[in-house]
């Protein structure tokens, strides 16, 4: 993520970094504090619901580097719940982030930018954006 943004023309335009959860492609866990520090921006991992951490660790135990993955999960910090939002944040006060998420969310629990990114990715990968696409 850092490599994509550091030398891009877009970095100066960013105010926050929104992530759809703390992991990519399964259990490739993001180092949220390092990301926030490197980019000098608040970084937020938004979740649709409170995760079952015991089940997450159990699933990760089947993969290599369990201890490193657990460390990254812990480094990401507290999981905050400001209904309807569940998130982890580094680089800003959680109360401020809850207000920011409200402004970025049209309806539901997911900020529009993440919802749109998901739709675009699904369309590119599957040729459609959902089960109802024709």
Give a label for each model feature.
Residues 8-12, 30, 37:
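Domain-level cores of phosphate- or acyl-group-handling catalytic modules
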Residues 21-30, 49-52, 92-95:
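Gly/Ser/Thr-rich loops at beta-strand to alpha-helix junctions
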